[in-house]
Amino acid sequence: MEIRDTTVGLDRPVQSGAWDPGATREQLALAGISGRCDLGGRDEDLWSRKSQKDETFKDCERRRGGEAPRLLCDKWRRDREAEAVRRRVQSQRRQGGREDPDGPARVRGRRRRVAVCGHSPDRGPAREEHKGPAGGSDHKDLGHHKGPEVGSGLRGPQARQVCGRSRGHEVQRVQKGLRQGVQGHGCREVALDARLCLVRVLGRSGQKGRHGRLSVASRRLDGQEKVEKRGLFSLGA
């Protein structure tokens, strides 16, 4: 039987010979596996474990037709999981927000923020398209937008335009709230709950230009949406 190295995600033969599920560390070393897997000694569970939740192991076994030794390196699996988390965070940053509503709403970097539909209301030909009554935006009527989740990190005009009810007097109310709440302390970082048309403004952390963490979340209590306010303000729909 041909033994293949499954510890580093490579599909390459290691050594031909009989495979023993109860192999010791020395036998693994002879097979060329030791040194690439953080086994820490004999561990039969690493050979026999077949977890239904471990996608990397199932993919590895499926690629090899189920003939590979059932060895899953914990270190390699942890590295793969960490890489997946890093890629997911980067993807969320490119989309302008974080998955965790308690995480920082502002992402470092000079990347220009754009709306959910990929347009920017701040410059270029899309600006005219995004204009609505009273200087707000009726871009929602064009069918481009779906409401963002709380903590999406959208700022200023983008937060207004993706509101699920951003037309008519609703736009006026949102703009009024921004004037009253934002200009008072110079913070322009806002997040908006499209379902309730609530504007959340982050408080300052004591230094000009620096923003606090998003400490407001929309939660379902008694079957209704309740808004938790801690040092912030909100507008009713």
Curated annotation (Swiss-Prot):
Superkingdom of the source species: Viruses
Biased composition (Basic and acidic residues): 96-105, 120-148
Annotated segments matching region Disordered: 1-23, 82-167
Protein name from the UniProt record: Uncharacterized protein 058R
Organism: Frog virus 3 (isolate Goorha)
